[in-house]
Structure formats: structure tokens, C-alpha cells
């Protein structure tokens, strides 16, 4: 799967001389729709969690600690945002997707400086130690 991700990312950046290219939310969702993306901190590569994109608007987020939540995906202003059913009302997690050296990343818009790398995209479902809340 990693080879497929690398080839897809290389195709998206063909002809680009920039070392870092911002992706639109739709370009990001094109890569992960109906797939599962694994996220890690950057640059330390500590596991953060795995997100199964059930559709372009619904996910199951499995944190590294094994807990899970359903998410609603929205886009706007160049951001991909997630609202999880176990967060307090009004809490949103928004990210700006980008490519750097043919690797896929997301940068937080609320926690400045937080960057995560998508280290794998697969067709495997998420594994949770508990069922999502709703």
C-alpha cells in the first residue's frame, strides 16, 4: 500500500519544483476516501491514531490508546475539519493538508506547530478496543 500512496503522491506533484505543496481539502479526501489513514507525529513518528474514512463526510477515529469516536468531516477555507462525537460541543479539529518531498502531512490550524504525517493509507478497517459512542 505504501508504494501506491507514494506513486499517487508523486503523480500529484509531477512538474512541481516546490519542496512543499499545499493540497486542497478535495485533493486530500481523494487520497483517503473509503480508505484508512494512519497518522504519526512529525518529526518523531509517534503513533497518533488511525482514521477510517467511511465516506468524504464520515469517519471512525481510532486513537493510539485504542479508544474510538465517530467523526463528521467538513471542508472550507482550505481546511479539512473533524467533529468527533466524544468531544464537547463546538470543538473542531481542523488541518491543512500538504505534500513535502512526496510525503503527505497535515498541519493543525488550532495547535500551531502541530504537524502529523500520514504514514500509511490502506484498505484495512480500524481496530478499536471499544465501540464508538454513537
Label the predicted regions.
Residues 15-70, 76-134:
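Lipid interaction determinants
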Residues 3-13:
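Sec-dependent N-terminal signal peptides
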